[in-house]
Swiss-Prot record:
Keywords: Cytoplasm, Lipid biosynthesis, Lipid metabolism, Phospholipid biosynthesis, Phospholipid metabolism, Transferase. Homodimer. Probably interacts with PlsY. The keyword Cytoplasm applies. PANTHER family: FATTY ACID/PHOSPHOLIPID SYNTHESIS PROTEIN PLSX (PTHR30100), PHOSPHATE ACYLTRANSFERASE (PTHR30100:SF1). GO terms for biological process: fatty acid biosynthetic process; phospholipid biosynthetic process. Pathway: Lipid metabolism; phospholipid metabolism. This is Phosphate acyltransferase. InterPro entries: FA_synthesis (IPR003664), Phospholipid_synth_PlsX-like (IPR012281).
Amino acid sequence: MRIAVDAMGGDHAPKAIIDGVQKSLTAFSDIEITLVGDESKIKPYITNNERITILDAKEVIEPTDEPVRAVRRKKDSSMVKMAQEVSEGRADACISAGNTGALMTAGLFIVGRIDGIDRPALAPTLPTLDGSGFLLLDVGANVDAKPEHLVQYAMMGSIYAERVFPKSNPRVGLLNVGTEDKKGNDLTKKTFELLKASDLNFVGNVESRDLLEGVADVVVTDGFTGNIALKTIEGTALSVFKMLKETLTSSFTAKIAAGMMKPKLMQMKSKMDYSEYGGAALFGLKAPVIKAHGSSDENAIFHAIRQARDIVEKDVSAIIHQEVQKETTNES
């Protein structure tokens, strides 16, 4: 199995990317990595080049670049060349911590969409209090969606949750403003009826305040709402830990208490660290495309590679394709 990695994407590239790659090669003997980027900037950080191939790319798609224009014009960029490795069959999956819009564009137009999938969905796995995590999709691939798109999101998310988490008969929830059946706008009301009539394990509407309680294994929504939910969860977690730190360092007595509580605090922090779950997978494409967080460190890249490996190993993309074809046949 070979995974292509954009060495130049992210706030801490290329060092954090390469450190994460080398950590993954130590952990997984069955993978090989193609590092795509400026060879002169990559080589100084490689301590062991076993199972690493460098593909030189002199251009970088910057966070400020307009996504579609950048993918079209920067043909020698690390992100475009990385996606081409997958589309041309030299890699089984790809990972980038770079420009999110550009990665989605490269995924859609270079890697390619699965026939029958109307809209791809961006799906991170987020932490829950019991440590099992849940999948949230879409978080921004498409700000607008139709009920049929959300049903496809639920199908793709269920396949991922069943194969990768793994969860038997994963619970699907519809993000809404209330748990009652008739709550919401036209989109959620129509989606509710479609999900209720599907073969999925639909548990009904779920509210954002309950997401971290683990009320569902897969939560579907449109990309606009999903992105707001994602950023709210991230921001709240950061604020809580900031307040804890300020409180526990505010006095000598508080510092003593913090020292006594340190193991439990570290345990709590680890449980709520979303980087432990990997990156956000772009579902609906012919091969796995993973968006790592822009601020990814070595550990986050390691988990993104582990996630890509799991998706390839469990044939998630192929199973999604089979399911779509089966539904198309049934409809005709």
